[in-house]
Amino acid sequence: MSLAVTLASTSKSRRALLAAAGVEADGVAPNVDEESFRNTMRANKLPVREQAMQLAELKAMRVSAKRPGLVIGGDQMLALGDEAFDKPADLEAAKNHLRQLSGKSHTLETAIVICEDGAPIWRHLARPKLTMRPLTEDFIETYVSSCGDALLSTVGAYQLEGPGAQLFTRIEGDYFSILGLPLLPLLDYLRIRKVLPT
């Protein structure tokens, strides 16, 4: 019998990535106060990549304490230098994100942790680097207006799988990690655990 797989998230995009790759996983909300946890980590001056990893672990542990099998927790944070970006609260904040990122390179700290029986057993951190072209104010206004509230669900106020591709001059790292799930290393681990065929 194969191990059950649960995604400690209600993220439609992460579930869709897993399903498209042939991984059946239930999505369960981890019920974590992410904002409070992030504020504590930032007050302690943890590097952005460590913040993402700890939040991914917390999500997986919370759900794993109540669910059998393997529980996948994930988190993605955008780092511009040492500064962490959160999902924009509204469209004006999305515009400000884009203004700050314009003409610069940033990293998407994309962490996943797998827990079993309430304890972490596997971790992976992907760090795709994206370079945004210089954006004009007119472009930012038009882009945000046309994409609308969809931009509020991403840390960078862009969706690479759509018109957000127009924002970049260079991308280093794998596509799945940019979308929020380092899928290839995850699939490797699931094969090791015999969740997927080898």
From Swiss-Prot:
Reaction(s) catalysed (UniProt annotation): a ribonucleoside 5'-triphosphate + H2O = a ribonucleoside 5'-phosphate + diphosphate + H(+); a 2'-deoxyribonucleoside 5'-triphosphate + H2O = a 2'-deoxyribonucleoside 5'-phosphate + diphosphate + H(+)
EC annotation from Swiss-Prot or TrEMBL: 3.6.1.9
Cofactor: a divalent metal cation
Location(s), subcellular: Cytoplasm
One record GO biological process: nucleotide metabolic process
Keyword Iron: no
Superkingdom of origin organism: Bacteria
A Pfam short name: Maf
Enzyme class: hydrolase
Keywords: Cytoplasm, Hydrolase, Nucleotide metabolism
MF (Gene Ontology): nucleoside triphosphate diphosphatase activity
UniProt record similarity statement: Belongs to the Maf family.
Name of the protein: Nucleoside triphosphate pyrophosphatase
Species per Swiss-Prot/TrEMBL record: Hyphomonas neptunium (strain ATCC 15444)
